[in-house]
UniProtKB/Swiss-Prot annotation:
It is a multi-pass membrane protein. It comes from Mesocricetus auratus (Golden hamster). Residues 30-439 are extracellular. It catalyses: butanoate(out) = butanoate(in); (9Z)-octadecenoate(out) = (9Z)-octadecenoate(in); (9Z,12Z)-octadecadienoate(out) = (9Z,12Z)-octadecadienoate(in); tetradecanoate(out) = tetradecanoate(in). This is Platelet glycoprotein 4. One of its GO terms (cellular component) is apical plasma membrane. Glycans are attached at residues 79, 102, 132, 205, 235, 247, 321, 417. The record marks 463 as: Critical for TLR4-TLR6 dimerization and signaling. Interacts with THBS1 and THBS2; the interactions mediate the THBS antiangiogenic activity. Upon interaction with a ligand, such as oxidized low-density lipoprotein (oxLDL) or amyloid-beta 42, rapidly forms a complex with TLR4 and TLR6; the complex is internalized and triggers an inflammatory signal. Through its C-terminus, interacts with PTK2, PXN and LYN, but not with SRC. LYN kinase activity is required for facilitating TLR4:TLR6 heterodimerization and signal initiation. Upon interaction with ligands such as diacylated lipopeptides, interacts with the TLR2:TLR6 heterodimer. The gene is CD36. Multifunctional glycoprotein that acts as a receptor for a broad range of ligands. Ligands can be of proteinaceous nature like thrombospondin, fibronectin, collagen or amyloid-beta as well as of lipidic nature such as oxidized low-density lipoprotein (oxLDL), anionic phospholipids, long-chain fatty acids and bacterial diacylated lipopeptides. They are generally multivalent and can therefore engage multiple receptors simultaneously, the resulting formation of CD36 clusters initiates signal transduction and internalization of receptor-ligand complexes.
Amino acid sequence: MGCDRNCGLIAGAVIGAVLAVFGGILMPVGDMLVEKTIKKEVVLEEGTIAFKNWVKTGTTVYRQFWIFDVQNPDEVAVNSSKIKVKQRGPYTYRVRYLAKENITQDPVDSTVSFVQPNGAIFEPSLSVGTENDTFTILNLAVAAAPHIYTNSFVQVVLNSLIKKSKSSMFQTRTLRELLWGYKDPFLSLVPYPIPTTVGVFYPYNDTADGVYKVFNGKDDINKVAIIDSYKGKRNLSYWESYCDMINGTDAASFPPFVEKSRVLRFFSSDICRSIYAVFGSDIELKGIPVYRFILPAKAFASPVQNPDNHCFCTEKVISNNCTSYGVLDISKCKQGRPVYISLPHFLHASPDISEPIEGLNPNEEEHRTYLDVEPITGFTLQFAKRLQVNILVKPARKIEALKNLKRNYIVPILWLNETGTIGDEKAEMFRNQVTGKVKLLGLVEMVLLGLGVVMFVAFMISYCACRSKNRK
């Protein structure tokens, strides 16, 4: 009987040891299986989970606009006073609802090329007003004229056309006109062929962004979704040195197995440059653990604060010899028009930029850009892209509408918040197919290992105790 009991205890200990060993073996083997599955499913080719969602996003994307309505246009034009603005919005559009087009796989270099059609549908229920709401804003054509045409004689001619068209420094426009374009009366009088339609995002509807050429990940999963070229080029021709490079992905996804220490690099055609995000915090999104990556303040810092930004400083006067920060001059990619990009309300901008403007209230929580990335797959499941469009206007002695100005203004026109969050149905599918299976595998591994160790220790203690008792 003693032998039977001892044998039973030994058998229990052996079973425990086997379970513990199996649990231990399952950890690396399970991780290998997960890694193999993920690598297969994030490749951008027909039949994978990634490809289906890549061709047409399953996430509803909204772009909200807040317009800066100028309250004292005459004071500014006559006395060069501070510009008083009042933010009005949001006015919401649904965007990025069209599938990618002209998708072409290249098996030779493991890339896939495409264009992204543009479209915007107004959402009245998510807006404070209609597309016919009017705003007092900077006259985009008048403000740009002295930047594009620097010759004094040409400016004299332009001044006569500005006066003839009854244009001034400021104008009243509807939301639809401001965003998507209007026939400008001044430009319509110019006696030689130039574009006469003006709008912050003109042209947009029925256009396409690209051609993009990205790596599909078949030969190297660490390159999946990374942009190989944009419009047939690997550089932008806007900036000097490495600032001109097209880096990273389009931010919709990143190579899998994202670590917190990784810097996520991505290219945005909206701001005509590549930029990056760094880890901010762990959060849970609809039951899915994600890493929140944020755009750091140093991305728009001056070269004095961040020497890596020296090649983004393209002129010395407006930037106070490259000491101002928080704005980016993108005029080179806007046909010479004096467009400056910043974070909303000049968040993280130097005081000299915001000093001539009253009515701004920068807020880190409301105005920062972030990406919520699921670390196993590298998919961006939620994002908020926030940026502000500004126009530089400066004194011009030959143009009466601008001759009374005594300072340069970087005038905020509007700011936008483009957001997307994985839907409930997609989130459930993601939990079931990805994170749920990984969690279950991890739980099984820990249960087997823990149960095996406990059984082994318990049965061995009992066996030793039993033998000790029998000897006595």
